[in-house]
Structure formats: structure tokens, C-alpha cells
């Protein structure tokens, strides 16, 4: 039960970076969906502005080329045009700012979490603690997550991304992840969640998750933390609530 979704086809359950990928991974949280939608909205403005500026530059170079225009223009001031190129960009920035501010607010909002998971970064592995659950000895669920060496990988597993113990969470549940570090700076990052939370020794940072679909999601430490920085991947397994409860029960009985 440690890796609940191993029997599903990898193409369905894995959200992982691909070779030569330049776009986003498939979103698994409402926040990531909002970020992607905002990106597409901004790209519209970027394309329109880029085409307009390129046209203006080309038109200027063509009409004011030395061989065609021996006498340079003496225009030094134009109130109307100056108002236009001041007010128009300000209006565009305002249109862009409103949805981005609401998204930034939502990214920092922690909504009545049902589960709290503590994440601790080490050189060079992650530790997870589920302090909401205690066994008969009042011990919480606590385990380390190391990268699987390349020679131990099974067919279909991803090089430099697989771990021996995944972080397991339920879908459609508000989750709080508390992140810190034991030695140097780390960063807990999973692209499909839009999550990137710095792990700082002596400080607790937090982020929230609300996963909408089952799957296995891959991330990596995103803060240079030493010689093996590239060898501390993150794997999050999102499963149904009954499977999650079963996994918790097995962990408590170990």
C-alpha cells in the first residue's frame, strides 16, 4: 500500500516533465488552472503589443530612412500622442493587475485545512510527518524519502525522479503543507500544483493544496543546496479518500 497507484498506467497517473517541454504540466489544483488561464490571457496582450510595436518600428525605419527623408522631422512635442502612450499602457497594466492580484491572494490563503503535513528538507532527501495521526504509542507517521538510484529503477520509472517513499495525500481535501529545512536552504516544488515553498532552517513556511484528480505528481528541490541538489526529487501520490485512510491505517500499524 506504500505506492497505491503503481498498478495504473503511467500515462494516466503521472504528471512529469517531458523532453524538450516548453509548456506547463497539466494542472491538478484550482490555483494552477488559474495561473495557466492568466498566462493565456496575458499572451493575448503580449502578442498585440509586440505586433503593434514591431509595426511602428518598421514604419519609422521605412519613412524616416535617410535616402527618403533628407530633412529630419522637427516635431518636438505632441500633447495628444503623449497622453495616448501614457494612459493606454497604464490602462492595460490595470487590466492585467486585477486578476493577478486575486490569484496572488488565493495562493497565500489557507482554507480550514483538514490535514497538516510537515515537510523537512535535508542534504539530500525529504522527510514527511503526518502529525494529525498517532498510533498506540503516541508516535506520528514519520518517514524519509530518498531518490531511487538509476540501477534500481524498474521499467517505466523516471530517472532522477523516483523515490522510495512517496508523499500520499487525498484528493478534494484542503491540505496544509508546513515546510522547513534541517541544514541549508531547500525548496519544495511540484509544478502541477504550482507549489514552490522555500525550506529555510529555523523557519516554518506553509503552502496549501487542493488536488482535484488522482495521480502521481513529480517535482524537485528548486533551491541550490549543494553537490547533490539535483538528486532530491519529490513524488506526491494523490488518491481517493478511502485509499488514503487505508494507507494511514497501514502506516500506523507498522
Curated annotation (Swiss-Prot):
InterPro entries per record: CcO_II, CcO_II-like_C, CcO_II_C, Copper_CuA, Cupredoxin, Cyt_c_oxidase_su2, Cyt_c_oxidase_su2_TM_dom, Cyt_c_oxidase_su2_TM_sf
Primary localisation category: mitochondrion
Organism: Chondrus crispus
Family, similarity comment: Belongs to the cytochrome c oxidase subunit 2 family.
Complexes and interactors: Component of the cytochrome c oxidase (complex IV, CIV), a multisubunit enzyme composed of a catalytic core of 3 subunits and several supernumerary subunits. The complex exists as a monomer or a dimer and forms supercomplexes (SCs) in the inner mitochondrial membrane with ubiquinol-cytochrome c oxidoreductase (cytochrome b-c1 complex, complex III, CIII).
Function as written in the Swiss-Prot or TrEMBL entry: Component of the cytochrome c oxidase, the last enzyme in the mitochondrial electron transport chain which drives oxidative phosphorylation. The respiratory chain contains 3 multisubunit complexes succinate dehydrogenase (complex II, CII), ubiquinol-cytochrome c oxidoreductase (cytochrome b-c1 complex, complex III, CIII) and cytochrome c oxidase (complex IV, CIV), that cooperate to transfer electrons derived from NADH and succinate to molecular oxygen, creating an electrochemical gradient over the inner membrane that drives transmembrane transport and the ATP synthase.
Broadest EC class assigned to this enzyme: translocase
Protein name according to UniProt: Cytochrome c oxidase subunit 2
NCBIfam families: CoxB (TIGR02866)
Highest rank taxon of the organism: Eukaryota
Location of the protein in the cell: Mitochondrion inner membrane
Chain ranges on the Mitochondrial matrix side, renumbered to this chain: 59-83
GO-annotated molecular function: copper ion binding; cytochrome-c oxidase activity
UniProt-annotated binding residues for Mg(2+): 223
Amino acid at each position: 500500500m506504500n505506492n497505491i497507484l503503481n498498478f495504473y498506467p503511467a500515462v494516466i497517473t503521472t504528471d512529469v516533465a517531458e523532453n524538450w517541454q516548453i509548456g506547463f504540466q497539466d494542472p491538478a489544483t484550482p490555483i494552477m488552472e488559474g495561473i495557466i488561464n492568466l498566462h493565456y490571457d496575458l499572451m493575448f496582450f503580449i502578442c498585440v503589443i509586440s505586433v503593434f510595436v514591431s509595426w511602428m518600428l518598421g514604419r519609422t525605419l521605412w519613412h524616416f530612412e535617410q535616402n527618403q527623408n533628407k530633412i529630419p522631422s522637427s516635431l518636438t512635442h505632441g500633447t495628444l500622442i503623449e497622453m495616448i502612450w501614457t494612459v493606454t499602457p497604464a490602462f492595460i497594466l490595470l487590466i492585467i493587475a486585477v486578476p493577478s492580484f486575486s490569484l496572488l491572494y488565493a495562493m497565500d490563503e489557507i482554507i480550514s485545512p483538514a490535514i497538516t503535513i510537515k515537510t523537512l528538507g535535508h542534504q539530500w532527501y525529504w522527510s514527511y510527518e503526518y502529525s494529525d495521526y498517532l498510533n498506540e504509542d503516541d508516535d506520528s507517521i514519520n518517514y524519509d524519502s530518498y531518490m531511487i538510484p538509476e540501477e534500481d529503477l524498474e521499467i517505466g520509472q523516471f530517472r532522477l525522479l523516483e523515490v522510495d517513499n512517496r508523499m500520499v495525500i487525498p484528493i478534494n481535501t484542503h491540505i496544509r503543507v508546513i515546510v522547513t529545512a534541517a541544514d541549508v536552504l531547500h525548496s519544495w516544488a511540484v509544478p502541477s500544483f504550482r507549489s514552490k515553498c522555500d525550506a529555510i532552517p529555523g523557519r516554518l513556511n506553509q503552502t496549501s493544496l487542493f488536488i482535484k484528480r488522482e495521480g502521481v505528481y513529480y517535482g524537485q528541490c528548486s533551491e541550490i543546496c549543494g553537490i547533490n541538489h539535483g538528486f532530491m526529487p519529490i513524488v506526491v501520490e494523490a488518491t481517493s479518500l478511502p485509499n488514503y485512510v487505508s494507507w494511514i491505517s497501514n502506516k500506523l500499524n507498522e
